[in-house]
């Protein structure tokens, strides 16, 4: 890039750099954002379709989970990646609503594009969008429905709503019960860490055969076949070390002149190992999990005492075992006491999906649990896992916040109506941006209708009519196209899913709108600059960006499919 300075050109950027400015830059970025939103739009709602994603190695993923789709698409365009970050933030914060947030973000950009063509400045749009978002969150807070932590029925409805439209939908009755029981088990005064709910996938059987284990499954086997296969009324020791003779930290040489001396060394090692096992026995342990190895001789003594032992357990398994059973890990087995032991009704080695694993179950008030998910194929089980993770997230958020909203496009329709009224009180051109924000929110009920095969205009008119008459919880029944009361039908989702979606979508849209200059360094040009392909300029993206930054023409593999 060069600029004139007098009669001499002033070189500012390298020859490989590419720059797009003004309306071209805005148009390119808006197009990228809209393309991302369009790629997941058909997955929204209970009648949403799935996507098949195939990576460079031939691995196949079949899903309609928004964030999974966007991650697997390997998008390179920087503006498009801002929209992907919206989905990732939504997934991290609340676990569901990723598609909603992305679709709203894309529609905000689409509405903004129309206003930009009418010479409304981008900063005016950004300011209006922010005002509308703040008002929307305020209105949502006022309309939220309170729910208590022990309202299991409502929590199950929330979990089921998160599974609707996914591969687990047919078994959502069974799975929602498992999810709620799991989250309630690990909750500490409404503070929930879903890491304490471990998910184990098993290929084979029906989804309905999935189960909740009140305890921990350790992906290990007992260290010796001579040990008991199962132990009832287990007293569990967690040894944060191995049952082995410790090596010295310094190199030493010992000259052995007599075979008896060698035997004395071996006897001494054996005695140390026996003392370790005796310490466990005296403490009352009949199950041992060791962080490191277990010597063969120690295995012999453990088996002789009827103690079931597992070696090289993972650190996260130790954490779960400690939380589930109440055991306290000890670093020196010789210091173990009865108070350090945890308790479980049963510890047994069982076959699960062709693999032998250790089941620690029947734990009283377990604070760490395991969900065993089953499905006919690997793809089915993977999709069930994604649905379960979403459900765990929304139940966690509901327990933490205690507030929910009706689903089915009801809150978006109500917000759109109230924001249009609010726009009348907003001065200047920001009023147009607030109205555009209201229009953008209606993309949710409109898309729900489209994906279900209903007329989106008729559905939206019916929804507006119901809300205008004061039915604020009226939403679209995607199965038959009727407008129904979402709360009474049990179609609800956490308040934070909606507020986070609006917040993230607005931030991403305003950030993209404020960009009026895009400069791509040579190494971001997708390898096209300088390529001897016979073209005088880079191909692909609008606004002259070419292959730079992934190129809108390619979108990192999205291409013309959108």
UniProtKB/Swiss-Prot annotation:
For this UniProt record, give its keywords in alphabetical order, as a comma-separated list.
ATP-binding, Chaperone, Nucleotide-binding
InterPro entries, per database record: Chaperone_TCP-1, Chaperonin_TCP-1_CS, Cpn60/GroEL/TCP-1, GroEL-like_apical_dom_sf, GROEL-like_equatorial_sf, TCP-1-like_intermed_sf, TCP-1_chaperonin, thermosome_alpha
- PROSITE patterns xref list: TCP1_1 (PS00750), TCP1_2 (PS00751), TCP1_3 (PS00995)
Q: Where is this region: Disordered?
A: 1-23, 526-551
Q: Which domain of life does the protein's organism represent?
A: Archaea
Its Gene Ontology molecular function terms? ATP binding; ATP hydrolysis activity; ATP-dependent protein folding chaperone; unfolded protein binding
Query: What Gene3D superfamilies does this protein map onto?
Result: GroEL, GroEL-like equatorial domain, TCP-1-like chaperonin intermediate domain
Do you know which CDD domains this protein is assigned to?
cpn60 (cd03343)
Q: Where is the composition biased (Gly residues)?
A: 537-551
* One Pfam short name: Cpn60_TCP1
Q: Name one GO biological process term.
A: protein folding
Record function comment: Molecular chaperone; binds unfolded polypeptides in vitro, and has a weak ATPase activity.
What family does the database annotate? Belongs to the TCP-1 chaperonin family.
Q: How does it assemble?
A: Forms an oligomeric complex of eight-membered rings.
Q: What is this protein called?
A: Thermosome subunit alpha
Originating species: Halobacterium salinarum (strain ATCC 700922 / JCM 11081 / NRC-1) (Halobacterium halobium)
């Amino acid at each position: 890039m060069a600029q004139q300075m007098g009669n001499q050109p002033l070189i500012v950027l390298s020859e490989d750099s590419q720059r797009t400015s003004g309306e071209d830059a805005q148009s390119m970025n808006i197009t990228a954002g809209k393309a991302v939103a369009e790629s997941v739009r058909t997955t929204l709602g209970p009648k949403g379709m799935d996507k098949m994603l195939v990576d460079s190695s031939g691995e196949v993923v079949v899903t309609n989970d928004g964030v999974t789709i966007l991650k697997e698409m390997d998008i390179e365009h920087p503006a498009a990646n801002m929209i992907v970050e919206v989905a990732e933030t939504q997934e991290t914060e609340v676990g569901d609503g990723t598609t909603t947030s992305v679709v709203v973000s894309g529609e905000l950009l689409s509405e903004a594009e129309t206003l930009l063509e009418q010479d409304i400045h981008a900063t005016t749009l950004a300011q209006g969008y922010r005002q509308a978002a703040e008002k929307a969150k305020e209105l949502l807070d006022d309309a939220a429905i309170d729910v208590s932590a022990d309202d299991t029925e409502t929590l199950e409805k929330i979990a089921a709503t998160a599974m609707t439209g996914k591969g687990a939908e047919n078994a959502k009755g069974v799975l929602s019960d498992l999810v709620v029981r799991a989250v309630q088990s690990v909750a500490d005064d409404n503070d929930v860490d879903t890491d304490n709910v471990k998910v184990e996938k098993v290929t084979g059987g029906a989804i309905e055969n999935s189960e909740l284990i009140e305890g921990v499954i350790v992906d290990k086997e007992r260290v010796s076949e001579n040990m008991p296969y199962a132990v009832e009324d287990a007293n569990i020791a967690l040894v944060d070390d191995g049952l082995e003779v410790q090596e010295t930290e310094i190199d030493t040489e010992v000259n052995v002149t007599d075979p008896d001396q060698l035997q004395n060394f071996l006897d001494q090692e054996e005695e140390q190992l026996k003392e370790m096992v005796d310490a466990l026995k005296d403490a009352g342990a009949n199950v041992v999990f060791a962080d490191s190895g277990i010597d063969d001789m120690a295995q012999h003594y453990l088996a002789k005492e009827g103690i079931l032992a597992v070696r090289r357990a993972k650190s996260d398994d130790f954490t779960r075992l400690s939380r589930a059973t109440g055991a306290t890990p000890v670093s020196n087995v010789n210091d173990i006491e009865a108070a350090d032991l945890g308790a479980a009704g049963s510890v047994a080695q069982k076959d699960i999906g062709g693999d032998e694993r250790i089941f620690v179950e029947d734990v009283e008030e377990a604070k760490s649990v395991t969900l065993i998910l089953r499905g006919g194929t690997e793809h089915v089980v993977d999709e069930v896992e994604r649905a379960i993770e979403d459900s765990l997230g929304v139940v966690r958020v509901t327990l933490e916040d205690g507030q929910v909203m009706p689903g089915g496009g009801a809150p978006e329709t109500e917000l759109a109506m109230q924001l249009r009224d609010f726009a009348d009180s907003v001065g200047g051109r920001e009023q147009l941006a607030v109205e555009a924000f209201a229009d953008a929110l209606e993309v949710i009920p409109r898309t729900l209708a489209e994906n279900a095969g209903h007329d989106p205009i008729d559905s939206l008119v019916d929804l507006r009519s119901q809300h205008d008459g004061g039915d604020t919880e009226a939403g679209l029944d995607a199965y038959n196209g009727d407008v129904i009361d979402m709360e009474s039908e049990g179609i609800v989702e956490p308040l934070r899913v909606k507020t986070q979606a609006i917040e993230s979508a607005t931030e991403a849209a305003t950030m993209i709108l404020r960009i009026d200059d895009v400069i791509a360094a040579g190494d971001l040009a997708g390898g096209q600059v300088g390529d001897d392909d016979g073209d005088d300029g880079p191909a692909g993206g609008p606004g002259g960006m070419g292959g730079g930054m992934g190129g809108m023409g390619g979108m990192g593999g999205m291409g013309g499919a959108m």
